[in-house]
Amino acid sequence: MKVIKTLSIINFFIFVTFNIKNESKYSNTFINNAYNMSIRRSMAESKPPTGTGASGSAGSGAGASGSAGSGDGAVASARNGANPGADAEGSSSTPATTTTTTTTTTTTTTNDAEASTSTSSENPNHNNAETNPKGKGEVQKSNQANKETQNNSNVQQDSQTKSNVPPTQDADTKSPTAQPEQAENSAPTAEQTESPELQSAPENKGTGQHGHMHGSRNNHPQNTSDSQKECTDGNKENCGAVTSLLSNSSNIASINKFVVLISAKLVLSFAIFI
């Protein structure tokens, strides 16, 4: 009799411990699955967009290249604006050589003033010398006037070329004071070219840092908030999946408890009657 009682008690404890282990396993697995599903949904909804900083930097680079192009255009316009003056001077002096004979004068608006003045001054003079042998003195005077205009235009071109040509090594060695002046003149241009990049850089950096900090701080709290919003906003499907798993685990736990109570009653009844 005592042996049966002890065996029944041992079986009861074994059964209880087995049911408790099974209950803990089922409950843990269901809870973990529900938590993982909620985390995956919240992560899928809170993916931050990428590729914002790159476009800003590209825009700043395009602005720098546009400013460089405008500088070249200004130099070209300055050169073209200075040379037509010499062409106008050369062409204004040519009508003095025209006589009663009809001569065609062609004026070309090129950058070289020598070609325009030579073509417009030499050809009419030869025609005048052949057709008017009597007026040689006038032709000589006109030739002298044309030579003076050519010399003036050549001097202007030389001055322009000297101003445009960079200083050679001999000039640098002879005048050491020219180098610091050139460095000072080049410094403000470098500052001007760097200024648009500096103006556009802090905005891009600020937005990039703000986006990264915002994403890193709000990843974890958004998980819980999104899982709560799914149930509160009326998304019954998402909320139902989580609650169904939890309800299944609770039902299994209640069934295990009921089985344990029944087995305990049976063991006690056998022990009492025996």
UniProtKB/Swiss-Prot annotation:
Region spans: Disordered: 43-234
Signal peptide stretch: 1-20
Compositionally biased tracts (Gly residues): 53-72
Topology class, membrane: Lipid-anchor; GPI-anchor
Chain intervals for the UniProt region annotation (Polymorphic region): 44-200
Extent of Low complexity compositional bias: 91-121
Keyword Lipid biosynthesis set for record: no
Any GO BP annotation: cell adhesion
Residue numbers with lipid attached (GPI-anchor amidated asparagine): N248
Propeptide, chain numbering: 249-274
Stored InterPro entries: MSA2
Biased composition range(s): Polar residues: 122-131, 140-167, 174-202
TM ranges: none
Glycosylated sites: N22, N36, N151, N223, N248
Pfam families in the record: MSA_2
Function: May play a role in the merozoite attachment to the erythrocyte.
Protein name, UniProt field: Merozoite surface protein 2
Protein species of origin: Plasmodium falciparum (isolate kf1916)
